[in-house]
């Protein structure tokens, strides 16, 4: 059903073109579905310094969690929490196409860990539009035999 709906998605207008008019997911729709506030600070990764750091050598999801989960202590360390948030953002919130944790979400994870009021619904909305556009491009390439 989703693939059928994507046939109505227009990349240039980022809208579904239906018989009764155009339709698009809005920031309020994302906020309602995810229970995230549509307000908050805009995420800015530039110039943000933090003392929290961890190893990004092995990024496959399973290995990443095993390497950043301390089983010796019941308390969650800052590094563990940031690693989990990075994993969570990469796999479940922004649904990266890779089978690895995306390093790009580390700064956002650190800011969330430190309690910064980041407006995630704007980021998710943008990611949704980008994913819909990419899905439509993939469908068209498959249908034309390019892929």
Residue ranges of model-derived segments:
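N-terminal leader regions that mediate targeting or early regulatory function
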Residues: 1-103, 107-110, 114, 118, ...
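Helix-rich DNA/chromatin-recognition modules in eukaryotic regulators
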Residues: 14, 24, 140-146
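Extended amphipathic alpha-helical bundle segments that form the ordered cores
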Residues: 121-125, 129-143
């Amino acid at each position: 059903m989703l693939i059928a709906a994507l046939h109505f998605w227009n990349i240039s207008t980022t809208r579904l073109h239906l018989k009764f008019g155009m339709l698009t997911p809005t920031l309020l729709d994302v906020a309602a579905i995810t229970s995230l506030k549509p307000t908050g600070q805009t995420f800015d990764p530039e110039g943000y310094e933090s003392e929290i750091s961890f190893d990004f050598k092995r990024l496959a999801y399973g290995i990443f969690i095993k390497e950043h989960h301390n089983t010796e202590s019941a308390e969650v360390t800052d590094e563990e929490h940031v690693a989990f948030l990075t994993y969570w953002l990469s796999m479940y919130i922004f649904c990266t196409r890779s089978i690895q944790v995306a390093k790009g979400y580390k700064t956002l994870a650190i800011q969330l860990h430190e309690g910064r009021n980041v407006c995630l619904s704007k980021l998710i909305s943008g990611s949704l539009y980008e994913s819909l556009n990419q899905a439509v491009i993939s469908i068209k390439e498959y249908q034309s035999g390019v892929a």
